[in-house]
């Protein structure tokens, strides 16, 4: 079932009024990979009437008022990605296209969409509460360095003047807000819900205090300290509030919601999604973002990889939840009934596919300890379970109508070597690879990899060798390709040339999967970029801030110039 986007669609459902209206910077795609559809269906399954306004024109009241006034609240998200990332390249050039917009047209969402949409709502519905959510709001919930303006900005909750902010994967927190407002109409009573950020005029009596907005604005190393505290103490099992002074007020983060149980996760993904672009938006053109996920399966939520540059660890947490085999197989059966299904499940996974079935007894009871699970080596307490993942893939392949099952990306290759015999999994993985397996070594230089919290590049080479050798023995022409990042903190010309030489010597091809590091809010790497120090060691870090040099670093690794750059 599509959620309504117009009054006419409301009438067809017999709804005279909506309880909740969700506003998003993406086109409305009714698929579980799109946050608004996910939250919307979850709320409807609990008896609430929910409508969606996607990519409203923020210059007029026409779109934002078309569904009327909601009974409970507006929910606002910039979309699946930060609006500044959606609108600008790593060279700060305005993007001309947008994969989340019909027809791929750029410019359909405003910069800092969360703030703009909230201001629009407050202008025409000043008495209706506004609740922020999604990746942009979640990673900007405290004072944060904003690369596009090159300054520290206040919490998006303060800047937008919204009423509440839900961080992380927000199903249960949003449901709690809806239930309390439905019973009492009192937004103040929602401030006790886990997974919620709110502001207070008085200093909280308990919790961890982060360096203030003024402190981190004046002293970048205080920002690194704040990020470290936020990373270690944002954990459902530690149950500790975190707060930060911003001017005369305090931004308060309640402890996060606990990870969803397997039963809860199973129910979520089997809600009645259409898995299509809503007709209202489909008539405007194709939405490219659905093409890569339409026939994919999310099996895992969360990741304990702790890559410094990754926003998903900060958003989905290090606690891994995974769906039952029965739930996943049922979703596959649903996909096989789609008219345009051609027999291929394009991907099975999540942030890291081969964490399916894995766990850690310490993290599951006491929370994240002050060590990294996979860096510098895989912790002995972590339990790999690649057999269960392979069993899942084999079961999917047996379903009538399924000809191919692929794992296209999201494999943490160092985790495979935690098994007694890595070749057992690698051999099976060959069967489920669509020609090329995309891995993410990210760099080659030991210093840069250390700052990224990534394994030594030798493990990537060993995995690549074993995979391609086994594929050849099996009569398969399948290969491993790598993703790389340039311009990350710690990389100068020496490290960049090291990466170039590594590619030339070991890969045998010129990779196109190279991106320039973008300092996005809320990540450890961004804290390094702004502060010039590693938040966890306090060591000084070289940071290349020149856009011109960063672009040249990419050209150097892409072999667009003959010879190495001399610096």
Swiss-Prot record:
GO terms for molecular function: 4 iron, 4 sulfur cluster binding; catalytic activity; iron ion binding. Residues 288-560 form the Radical SAM core domain. SMART domains: Elp3. The keyword Transmembrane does not apply. Its cofactor is [4Fe-4S] cluster. Keywords: 4Fe-4S, Iron, Iron-sulfur, Metal-binding, S-adenosyl-L-methionine. Binds 1 [4Fe-4S] cluster. The cluster is coordinated with 3 cysteines and an exchangeable S-adenosyl-L-methionine. Belongs to the UPF0313 family. This is UPF0313 protein TM_0337. The lineage of its organism: Bacteria, Thermotogati, Thermotogota, Thermotogae, Thermotogales.
């Amino acid at each position: 079932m599509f959620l309504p986007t117009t009054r006419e669609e409301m009438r067809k459902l017999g709804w005279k009024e909506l309880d909740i209206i969700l506003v998003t910077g993406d086109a409305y795609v009714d698929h579980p990979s799109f946050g608004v559809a996910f939250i919307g269906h979850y709320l409807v399954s609990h008896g609430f009437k929910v409508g969606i306004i996607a990519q409203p024109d923020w210059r007029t009241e026409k779109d934002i008022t078309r569904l009327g006034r909601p009974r409970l609240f507006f929910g606002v998200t910039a979309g699946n990605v930060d609006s500044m990332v959606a609108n600008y390249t790593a060279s700060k050039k305005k993007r001309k296209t947008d994969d989340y917009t019909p027809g791929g047209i750029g410019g359909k969402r405003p910069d800092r969409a969360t703030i703009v949409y909230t201001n629009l709502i407050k202008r025409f519905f000043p008495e209706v509460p506004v609740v922020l959510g999604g990746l942009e709001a979640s990673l900007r919930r405290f004072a944060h360095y904003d690369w596009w303006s090159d300054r520290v900005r206040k919490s998006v909750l303060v800047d937008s003047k919204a009423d509440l902010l839900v961080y992380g994967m927000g199903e249960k927190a949003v449901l709690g807000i809806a239930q309390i407002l439905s019973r009492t109409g009192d937004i103040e009573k929602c401030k006790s819900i886990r997974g919620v950020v709110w502001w207070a005029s008085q200093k909280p009596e308990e919790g961890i205090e982060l360096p203030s907005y003024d402190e981190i604005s004046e002293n970048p190393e205080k920002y690194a300290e704040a990020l470290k505290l936020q990373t270690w103490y944002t954990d459902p099992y530690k149950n500790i509030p975190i707060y930060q002074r911003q001017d005369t007020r305090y931004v308060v983060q309640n402890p996060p919601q606990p990870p969803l149980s397997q039963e809860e996760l199973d129910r979520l993904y089997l809600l009645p999604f259409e898995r299509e672009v809503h007709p209202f938006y489909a008539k405007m053109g194709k939405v490219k973002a659905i093409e890569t996920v339409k026939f994919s399966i999310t099996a895992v939520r969360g990741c304990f990889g702790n890559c410094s540059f990754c926003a998903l660890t900060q958003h989905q947490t290090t606690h891994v939840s995974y769906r039952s085999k029965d739930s996943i197989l049922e979703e596959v059966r649903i996909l096989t009934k789609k008219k345009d299904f051609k027999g291929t499940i394009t991907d099975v996974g999540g942030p890291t596919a081969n964490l399916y079935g894995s766990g850690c007894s310490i993290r599951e009871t006491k929370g994240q300890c002050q060590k990294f699970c996979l860096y510098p080596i895989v912790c002995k307490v972590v339990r790999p379970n690649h057999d269960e993942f392979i069993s899942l893939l084999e079961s999917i392949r047996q379903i009538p109508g399924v000809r191919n099952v692929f794992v296209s990306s999201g494999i943490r290759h160092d985790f495979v070597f935690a098994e007694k015999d890595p070749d057992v999994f690698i051999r099976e993985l060959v069967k489920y690879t669509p020609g090329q397996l995309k891995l993410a070594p990210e760099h080659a230089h030991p210093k840069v990899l250390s700052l990224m919290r990534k394994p030594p590049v030798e493990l990537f080479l060993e995995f690549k060798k074993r995979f391609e050798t086994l594929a050849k023995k099996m009569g398969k022409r399948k290969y491993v390709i790598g993703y790389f990042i340039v311009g990350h903190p710690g990389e100068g010309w020496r490290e960049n040339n090291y990466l170039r030489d590594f590619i030339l010597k070991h890969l045998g091809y010129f990779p196109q999967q190279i991106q320039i590091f973008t300092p996005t809010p809320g990540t450890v790497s961004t804290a390094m970029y702004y502060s010039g120090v590693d938040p966890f060691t306090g060591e000084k870090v070289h940071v290349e801030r020149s856009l011109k040099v960063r672009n040249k670093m990419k050209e150097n690794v892409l072999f667009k110039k003959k010879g190495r750059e001399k610096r």
